[in-house]
């Protein structure tokens, strides 16, 4: 299931990039071309350029969100594996140093456990996880 969320964040980033590359720039080029051929100067095209940058900023937000999802998942997995490692290497139940280190990682361990035990939480996003047929 975690693989599906990583895949989702990857597809979200790819979608944001494709939107900028395939949609924003061609529309901008077309509008600027029409404006210049109709006699407007580049200074007159500020509104067109402003719309381009607004569209790019919106798409970059999606890409940043995708990166944050991926970063969060990787952090949770890292902390969970460290938690399990600390617990496995405890000398005894009263090893306070190990317990202190494990306690710091316990929150992410619990979050991952709840996430994996929910089972159907990915049903809401099922449409995003379908294989991409190119």
Give residue ranges: language-model regions.
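Extended, charge-rich low-complexity regions and/or helical-solenoid scaffolds
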Residues: 1-134
């Amino acid at each position: 299931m975690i693989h599906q969320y990583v895949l989702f964040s990857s597809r979200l980033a790819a979608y944001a990039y494709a939107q900028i590359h395939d949609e924003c720039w061609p529309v901008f080029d077309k509008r600027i071309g029409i404006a210049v051929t109709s006699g407007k100067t580049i200074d007159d095209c500020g509104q067109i350029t402003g719309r381009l940058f607004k569209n790019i900023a919106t798409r970059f937000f999606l890409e940043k969100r995708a990166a944050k999802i991926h970063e969060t998942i990787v952090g949770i997995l890292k902390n969970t594996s460290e938690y399990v490692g600390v617990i496995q290497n405890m000398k005894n139940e009263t090893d306070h140093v190990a317990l202190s280190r494990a306690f710091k990682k316990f929150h992410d361990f619990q979050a991952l456990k709840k996430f994996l035990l929910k089972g159907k939480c990915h049903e809401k996003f099922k449409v995003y996880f379908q294989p991409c047929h190119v």
